[in-house]
């Protein structure tokens, strides 16, 4: 497993970053929290997970080990692959996901595009006790989450849409279209749903 990458950030997009590691440009599919920490031209270290498929090798990047570990544990539930796990971390922090599983809050899980009521119930059933207890030291506080939301909502919406199969260009256009709905404290899940409705009508 490639546990982390360290190098200069060459570029940063809506859901990916390219990091120069010893002269090799590594494309990393990142959570919004990971992307928010990267600055083009600066050195960075990103926690990573390598997903191997018959026809591809894909690196996923995270803000810290907690995000990466949560990403990997989410995939132990049936029907949850890398893209859906990344979408879950685009909407919720790891601690919010732990809390949702521990309290059987299926409504919180259905805020993630691609998860319906039955899927949320299955995820709760299969992951109960596997994500750890909520309230860990690495979790963002409600105040931190609220402060981050105005800055990061667009990246989260774009990342969520791309993870659901839309192109980066389509996702960015949809995010721009719902920007007027954001307000001072954006509801990322509501903005994602609104963007999805616009894309479905297009």
Swiss-Prot record:
User: Region Domain II: which residues?
Assistant: 64-142
What are the recorded Gene Ontology BP terms? Answer: DNA recombination; DNA repair
Q: Which GO terms of the molecular function aspect are on file?
A: ATP binding; four-way junction DNA binding; four-way junction helicase activity
Give the transmembrane ranges.
none
Q: Return the SUPFAM superfamilies for the record.
A: DNA helicase RuvA subunit, C-terminal domain, Nucleic acid-binding proteins, RuvA domain 2-like
CC annotations in GO: cytoplasm; Holliday junction helicase complex; Holliday junction resolvase complex
Ordered alphabetically, the record's keywords are: Cytoplasm, DNA damage, DNA recombination, DNA repair, DNA-binding
Q: Where is this region: Flexible linker?
A: 143-152
Q: What does this protein's UniProt record list under function?
A: The RuvA-RuvB-RuvC complex processes Holliday junction (HJ) DNA during genetic recombination and DNA repair, while the RuvA-RuvB complex plays an important role in the rescue of blocked DNA replication forks via replication fork reversal (RFR). RuvA specifically binds to HJ cruciform DNA, conferring on it an open structure. The RuvB hexamer acts as an ATP-dependent pump, pulling dsDNA into and through the RuvAB complex. HJ branch migration allows RuvC to scan DNA until it finds its consensus sequence, where it cleaves and resolves the cruciform DNA.
Say which family it is in. Answer: Belongs to the RuvA family.
Q: What is this protein called?
A: Holliday junction branch migration complex subunit RuvA
Source species, please? Thermobifida fusca (strain YX)
């Amino acid at each position: 497993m490639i546990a982390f990458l360290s190098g200069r950030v060459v570029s940063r997009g809506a859901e990916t970053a390219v990091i120069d590691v010893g002269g090799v440009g590594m494309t990393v599919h990142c959570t919004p929290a990971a992307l928010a920490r990267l600055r083009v031209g600066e050195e960075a270290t990103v926690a990573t997970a390598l997903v191997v498929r018959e026809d591809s090798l894909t690196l996923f990047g995270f803000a810290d080990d907690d995000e990466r570990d949560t990403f990997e544990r989410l995939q132990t539930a049936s029907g949850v692959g890398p893209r859906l796990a990344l979408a879950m971390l685009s909407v919720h922090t790891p601690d919010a996901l732990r809390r949702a599983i521990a309290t059987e809050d299926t409504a919180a899980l259905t805020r993630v595009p691609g998860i319906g009521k039955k899927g949320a119930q299955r995820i709760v059933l299969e992951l109960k006790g596997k994500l750890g207890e909520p309230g860990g030291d690495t979790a963002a506080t409600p105040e931190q989450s609220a402060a981050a939301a105005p800055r990061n909502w667009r990246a989260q919406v774009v990342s969520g849409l791309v993870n659901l199969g839309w192109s980066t260009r389509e996702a960015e256009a949809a995010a721009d279209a719902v920007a007027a709905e954001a307000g001072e404290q954006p509801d990322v899940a509501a903005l994602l749903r609104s963007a999805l409705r616009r894309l479905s009508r297009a």
